Regions:
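RNA pseudouridine synthases
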Residues: 2-319
Length: 319
């Protein structure tokens, strides 16, 4: 499906000296930089009626004329997949992602993803890069994610993430008993030998995780983590680096630790917990239009509640 878009903007004095692609991003903010650059290269976005290059310098007072065809992003199929929508308005959504849901199609997961579900939920997201997704959760991590419904909203939310002004808190259940909370400041990059894994490495990107103890058990601990950065697998890598890997983590968790004398139901759940015990519980950001502070919080999912119940019962029984 396609539609024609037409718009005209005069370059203000404040953008004198700017490149054409930079000025276009300011003046036609409903469209992504990538799309605008393609239109410039195709001659569908002109300067005073003449095709120019994206890097062309502007002097001010030029007329930028847009006449282009928008093709909806049909690379990915809209699929009727249930979403737990916590909040939604005209520009932003907050969802509670289920375990097992991949965020974006990739090799091995061509469909059935959050992106496919979002395209079905709101068809206009086909015009927003990545269907409005601005950050990710791992496949088996549950909890809160924000989604932009317009390009300007996406730009604003990404800027907040880059400025580290978005607050993201996670609950995790780890192997071991940290004495107290701590801050882990260690760079993360791709593992040198295993492409599926990340690792703490001097060549990695800066990564900072704060955690505090919520509840201690005989051999495990419920912790609450707060991210300053958003590296791939960050909490999982950092907690494993600190020697407190997450229960159930297939990449970083290692062998299950069974408390001495533990009852069979606890042994079973510790051996067979099907995913990393990690949940994005709280999300705070500024609304991309109003600037209002938005705070959302969701309860732990049933599988983590059951795990904590078994650990708590074991601790109380074996006192």
């Amino acid at each position: 499906m396609s539609r024609i878009v037409e718009d005209t903007q005069r370059v203000p004095a404040t953008l004198a000296g700017a490149r054409l692609d930079q000025a276009a991003a300011e003046l036609f903010s409903d469209y992504s930089r990538e799309r605008l650059k393609a239109w410039i290269n195709a001659g569908e976005l002109t300067v005073d009626g003449v095709q120019a290059k994206p890097k062309a310098k502007l002097h001010g007072d030029e007329v930028l004329a847009l006449q282009a065809t928008i093709e909806d992003d049909t690379r990915f199929e809209a699929q009727d997949i249930a979403l737990d929508v916590v909040y939604e308005d005209d520009t932003v959504m907050v969802i509670n992602k289920a375990a097992g849901m991949v965020v974006h199609p990739a090799a091995g997961n061509p469909d059935g993803t959050l992106l496919n579900a979002l395209l079905h939920h709101h068809s206009a997201l086909a015009e927003v890069p990545r269907a409005g997704i601005v950050h990710r959760l791992d496949k088996d991590t549950t909890g809160l994610m924000m989604v932009a419904k317009t390009v300007p909203a996406q730009t604003a939310l990404v800027a907040q993430l880059q400025a580290r002004s978005v607050s993201r808190q996670y609950d995790a259940v780890v192997i071991g008993k940290p004495v107290s909370g701590n801050t882990i400041d260690a760079p993360i990059g791709r593992h040198p030998k295993d492409r599926k894994r990340q690792a703490v490495t001097t060549s990695g990107k800066p990564a900072v995780t704060h955690f505090r103890v919520v509840e201690r058990f005989r051999a495990h601990t419920h912790v609450r983590c707060k991210l300053e950065t958003g590296r791939t697998h960050q909490i999982r890598v950092h907690m494993a680096h600190a020697r407190y890997p997450l229960i159930g983590d297939p990449l970083y968790g290692g062998r299950a630790k069974l408390p001495p004398g533990a009852a069979e139901p606890l042994k079973e759940i510790l051996r067979e917990f099907p995913r990393q015990a990690l949940h994005a519980r709280k999300l705070i950001f500024k609304h991309p239009v109003s600037g209002e502070s938005m705070m959302f919080q969701v309860d732990l999912p049933d599988d983590l509640l059951m795990l904590l119940d078994y650990l708590r019962e074991d601790s109380e029984t074996m006192r």
